[in-house]
Structures are given as structure tokens and as C-alpha cells.
């Protein structure tokens, strides 16, 4: 028997050692990570489980030989299609909610407020690639004239001067610059490319695009879809100026960073506490999921810290909760905008070589937002900045200085504007007045139907539209438009329309009742939450006060401040009139209970 037990014990010990060895090896296993760059190329490498996000960011910046790296970040999408920015201070494996191999994207995280203060051409080129993506995915809204100029700058940067021997009449059709390009827009791009941009090098054309893009209202805006308190779809975003709110193509709010006291969230509800002219206001918005709300809050905290403060040492840890309850805590750990600009001015090295890679022009945009039309009226802000005219004058002076610097640094590629004779456009000669009238300029809106914040030809970003998040009625309209077989039916069309109207009325009643019911429940839940928080705070206070009273009443500790409290008339009255009778009553009850227990 004794001999049989020994092998069994040894076998069990060996099994445990194998399990421990396997677990230790799993910590050192390499995980495959792929990062997609701004030109859609990819870099793949192996990381370990404890590798932090800063390693990935440094790896990409070393690949580019990039010094002005604080504008950039790495973004990924979790299995629930929620986007996140990779936290450089935390391990990558703990942030990813999926299994390796991991796929992430290198993107501009903080858009420079003044492109003129970017020191190196390499940084400007990467920002140019990001803005080109924003234009293609419909995130950068602009009027028709600005759209034509931006498109012409992209064409000039990628193919150079117009050459009639190399470029046929319809050469712009090969460029998919916008989600949807009208013929009128393409003709205007051709006109500007032929006559106004001749002689500009790629760096000058890219710089001109940055100057135009940064003057637009949606420059740097990554719209977050939300519902306001009335149920209207809005898009929230952050810029160097502050917090912006869009409805359609109209900016309805611009709240500057110094006016924002606090940003917090609770579940799917996002709050912005604003102090303007000594008046406190709270703006409330509702997201589709709690994860989207937390992402919106973290982006707001990071952008406010980056653009508002003068030094990174001034940035404090922010919490999303109230005083007595633990919530999400977050602190931005990078440099702020002023420190980045100051560090850029101190760069002393030979400019690194810029390797420009052209994205194929023939890629189709029909898999993205089919309804997006770039021809639009200019955006008119409902709340303009009070110092808007002064800012525009300063920007114009800076633009002139920047162009002079570029011309001096690149004498061989200085832009020659309007020196060549203008060639007639063959395509415009055949267009009649009726055709011009038929090409309508429809407004571009950041709407449920057209905006997809992570639309891409690659499989990683989100493919679903915003209407999936909020069950938009636009989907029902699309499904209704797909049924075209009613002409074959012998039913009375008029009766069918009447029945359809009745059904729509009933649906509206049901929707209004559901909305009122949900809003009532939300208000009730908010009241219950506040009451429960107050009750818990009172219980916590009692848990602190009662032990202190017992120490004062029962202990013989002779400390000066305790002796002074005991000698007060109020304490003596409480001791003789309340505490002593209560103690005697408790002692009697306990003795009776003990006697009863002893008798049984």
C-alpha cells in the first residue's frame, strides 16, 4: 500500500509543475500586432503581454523618423465596434478586448491649431494624409469653392503640373477624393489645377491644403453621435477652440475650453458643466452605449488638457463620479499643445526625407456613404466667436509669412501662380445651360444617413451606420423604397394610401407613448439614484459619528480635547437624560435574554 501511494503523489506533483510551467510560458508568448498607417500600408511585429502602448507609438515614430509625435495616437476597435485610443501608459493586452493578432490604426489624435508652427515637412505630410482621409470619409465639411480648391491641391500634390500629353480630359475621374463627386465639382478641380497651381511642389500643395483645411469649422472634429434632451440627433466633437455641437451641417454650440468647468458621465448620459458670464449651465446628451459615453468623456478630458493648459504639470486627475462614490478616474499623461510647439521650435537637425506613397486613385467610394454629396452651401455658425475677425486677420498674416518661408526653403519648387496661359476647358464647352441648372448643389450634412465615423476600405474600422445605433427611421424609409411591386397589384391605390396613413398615425402614437414612458422612467430612476446616494452618505456619516460617541462615553481616556467635550453642559445633559437610561434598558434586555437562554 505504501509503495502504491508514492508514485501517485509524485504524479500529482509533476502535473502541478507542468501547469505552472505552462502558465509562466504563456506570459512570455509573443503576440502578433499589425498597425495600419495613414497611407493604408501596414507594419507587423510581435509584442509581449506586458508591452505598453508607448512602445507601439515609439515604434511607428521611429519607423517614420518622426520627432513631432505628440499629435499622433493609435486607435483600435473592440468586438462591440466601439473605438478606443490606445493608452500609452497601460499594457496593450489589458486594453484589447479581443484575442491576438491585434489590428490597430496610426492616426492624428490632436490636430495642430496652427499648421504654420509645425517645424518639419514630414509632420505636415502625415497631417495632410489624415486630412485627405477626413475629406474622403465625409468628416471635413466645406462649401463648393473650398472643396474644389482642396481637391485641386490633392491632385497637384500627387501628379504635379497638368500635362495635356499625359492627362486626358477626364483624368480627374480617376481620383476618388470625395465620397461622391459631381461632374461640376470635377470640372472646377480641373480648372484650378490647370490654371492656379502650376509650379507648386508636393510640399507646397500639401501646405496650402493644410492652411485651407484648418480654417474650416469641422477641422479636427471627430463626430460622436448622440441624442440631446429633445431626442434630436446631434454630433459632438472637440477642436482646439473648444467643445462643438453639430446638428446637420450647422454648428449650434461652440463652448471654449476655459468656460468648461467639468465633463462627467453616468451610464449612457454625458454632462458638460459650463460657466459663462457667471451663469452655470449643464448640457446633457445621451449616447447609444455606456462604452460610447465613456469614450466621449475620455476624449473630452484629453482634448481639454491638451489645448487648455500651458504646462503638463497643471493637468490633474479627473473623475466622472460625485464626492462619495467611486467612478472612472483618468489623467492625461502627455505633453500639452504649448509644450509641443515649444519643443518643435527647438528641433535642430537636417529635415528627414519624406517618402510619399500614393493611394490608388481608382478605389471605389460606393461602398462607403452613397448619399454623401460634397456640393454644399457654406457652413454658418449659429454662435460665432466674438474675436473671429481679429483671428482671421492674424491667420492671414501668418499664412503670408508661411508661404514666404516655404518659397525661400524650396526655390526650385516655388509656386508660380497664373504665369502660364490658361487653356480652354474642352469639357465645359459642351455643357449647356440646362445641364448646369440640372446639377444641383445639395447641402452636406453630418447626418444619420451619411456619416460613418470609421468608414474605411479595410475590415478593421466600424462598418455600421449611425442609424443602427439609434434605430433611425431612415432605415424604415429605405426598406419602404425597396418595395416597387405595387403597380402589379389590383388593389385600389387610393385605399392603400389611406390605410398607410392610418398605420403611420398609429405608429406615431405608439412611438410618442413609448418616448414619454421612457423619459418618465429615466426621471424616476434619476430620483431613486440621487435618494440612494444621499441615504448611503448619511449611513456612512453615522458609521463615523457613532464610534466617536462611544469613545467619548465609555472610555477613560484622559485627553484634553475629550475632557473639554465631556465637561460641556450639552454633553452632560445628553449623558444623564438619554445615554444612561438607554444603557440601562439595553442591559435589562440583554440580562433577560441570557436568563431565558440559560433556562432553556
Curated annotation (Swiss-Prot):
It is a single-pass membrane protein. Residues 31-311 form the FERM domain. Residues 413-440 are annotated as: Disordered. GO terms for molecular function: cytoskeletal protein binding. InterPro entries: Band_41_domain (IPR019749), Ez/rad/moesin-like (IPR000798), FA (IPR014847), FERM/acyl-CoA-bd_prot_sf (IPR014352), FERM_2 (IPR035963), FERM_central (IPR019748), FERM_CS (IPR019747), FERM_domain (IPR000299). The keyword Protein biosynthesis does not apply. Keywords: Membrane, Transmembrane, Transmembrane helix. SUPFAM superfamilies: PH domain-like, Second domain of FERM, Ubiquitin-like. The keyword Membrane applies. One of its GO terms (cellular component) is membrane. It is found in: Membrane. This is FERM domain-containing protein 3. It comes from Xenopus tropicalis (Western clawed frog). The lineage of its organism: Eukaryota, Metazoa, Chordata, Craniata, Vertebrata.
Amino acid at each position: 500500500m505504501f509503495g502504491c501511494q508514492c508514485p501517485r503523489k509524485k504524479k500529482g506533483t509533476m502535473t502541478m509543475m507542468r501547469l505552472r510551467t505552462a502558465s509562466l510560458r504563456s506570459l512570455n508568448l509573443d503576440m502578433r500586432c499589425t498597425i495600419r498607417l495613414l497611407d493604408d500600408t501596414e507594419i507587423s511585429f510581435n509584442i509581449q503581454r506586458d508591452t505598453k502602448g508607448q512602445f507601439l507609438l515609439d515604434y511607428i515614430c521611429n519607423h517614420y523618423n518622426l520627432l513631432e509625435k505628440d499629435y499622433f495616437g493609435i486607435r483600435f476597435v473592440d468586438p462591440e465596434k466601439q473605438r478606443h485610443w490606445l493608452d500609452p501608459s497601460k499594457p496593450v493586452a489589458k486594453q484589447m478586448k479581443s484575442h491576438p493578432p491585434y489590428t490597430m490604426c496610426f492616426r492624428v489624435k490632436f490636430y495642430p491649431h496652427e499648421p504654420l508652427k509645425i517645424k518639419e515637412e514630414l509632420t505636415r505630410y502625415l497631417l495632410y494624409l489624415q486630412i485627405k482621409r477626413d475629406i474622403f470619409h465625409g468628416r471635413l465639411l466645406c462649401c463648393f469653392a473650398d472643396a474644389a480648391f482642396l481637391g485641386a491641391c490633392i491632385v497637384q500634390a500627387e501628379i504635379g503640373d497638368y500635362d495635356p500629353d499625359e492627362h486626358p480630359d477626364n483624368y480627374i475621374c480617376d481620383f476618388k477624393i470625395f465620397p461622391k463627386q459631381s461632374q461640376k465639382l470635377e470640372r472646377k478641380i480641373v480648372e484650378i489645377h490647370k490654371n492656379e497651381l502650376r509650379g507648386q511642389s508636393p510640399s507646397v500643395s500639401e501646405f496650402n491644403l493644410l492652411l485651407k483645411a484648418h480654417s474650416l469649422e469641422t477641422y479636427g472634429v471627430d463626430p460622436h453621435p448622440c441624442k440631446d434632451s429633445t431626442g434630436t440627433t446631434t454630433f459632438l466633437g472637440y477642436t482646439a477652440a473648444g467643445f462643438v455641437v453639430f446638428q446637420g451641417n450647422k454648428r449650434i454650440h461652440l463652448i471654449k475650453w476655459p468656460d468648461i468647468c467639468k465633463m462627467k458621465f453616468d451610464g449612457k448620459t454625458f454632462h458638460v458643466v459650463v460657466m459663462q458670464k457667471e451663469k452655470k449651465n449643464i448640457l446633457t446628451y445621451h449616447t447609444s452605449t455606456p462604452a460610447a459615453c465613456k469614450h466621449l468623456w475620455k476624449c473630452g478630458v484629453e482634448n481639454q488638457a491638451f489645448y487648455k493648459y500651458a504646462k503638463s504639470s497643471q493637468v490633474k486627475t479627473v473623475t466622472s463620479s460625485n464626492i462619495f462614490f467611486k467612478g472612472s478616474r483618468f489623467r492625461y499623461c502627455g505633453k500639452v499643445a504649448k509644450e509641443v510647439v515649444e519643443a518643435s521650435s527647438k528641433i535642430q537637425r537636417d529635415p528627414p526625407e519624406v517618402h510619399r506613397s500614393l493611394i490608388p486613385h481608382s478605389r471605389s467610394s460606393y461602398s462607403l456613404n452613397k448619399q454623401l454629396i460634397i456640393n454644399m452651401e457654406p457652413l454658418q455658425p449659429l454662435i460665432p466667436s466674438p474675436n473671429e475677425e481679429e483671428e482671421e486677420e492674424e491667420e492671414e498674416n501668418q499664412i503670408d509669412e508661411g508661404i514666404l518661408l516655404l518659397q525661400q526653403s524650396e526655390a526650385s519648387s516655388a509656386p508660380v501662380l497664373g504665369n502660364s496661359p490658361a487653356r480652354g476647358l474642352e469639357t465645359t464647352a459642351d455643357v449647356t445651360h440646362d445641364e448646369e441648372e440640372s446639377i444641383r448643389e445639395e447641402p452636406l450634412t453630418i447626418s444619420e444617413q451619411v456619416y460613418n465615423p470609421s468608414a474605411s476600405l479595410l475590415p478593421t474600422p466600424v462598418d455600421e451606420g449611425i442609424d443602427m445605433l439609434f434605430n433611425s427611421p431612415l432605415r424604415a424609409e429605405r426598406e419602404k423604397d425597396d418595395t416597387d411591386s405595387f403597380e402589379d397589384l389590383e388593389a385600389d391605390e387610393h385605399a392603400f394610401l389611406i390605410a398607410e396613413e392610418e398605420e403611420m398615425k398609429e405608429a406615431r402614437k405608439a412611438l410618442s407613448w413609448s418616448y414619454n414612458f421612457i423619459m418618465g422612467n429615466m426621471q424616476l430612476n434619476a430620483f431613486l439614484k440621487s435618494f440612494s446616494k444621499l441615504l448611503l452618505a448619511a449611513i456612512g456619516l453615522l458609521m463615523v459619528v457613532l464610534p466617536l460617541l462611544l469613545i467619548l462615553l465609555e472610555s477613560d481616556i484622559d485627553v484634553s480635547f475629550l475632557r473639554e467635550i465631556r465637561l460641556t453642559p450639552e454633553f452632560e445633559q445628553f449623558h444623564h437624560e438619554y445615554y444612561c437610561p438607554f444603557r440601562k434598558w439595553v442591559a435589562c434586555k440583554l440580562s433577560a435574554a441570557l436568563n431565558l437562554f440559560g433556562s432553556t
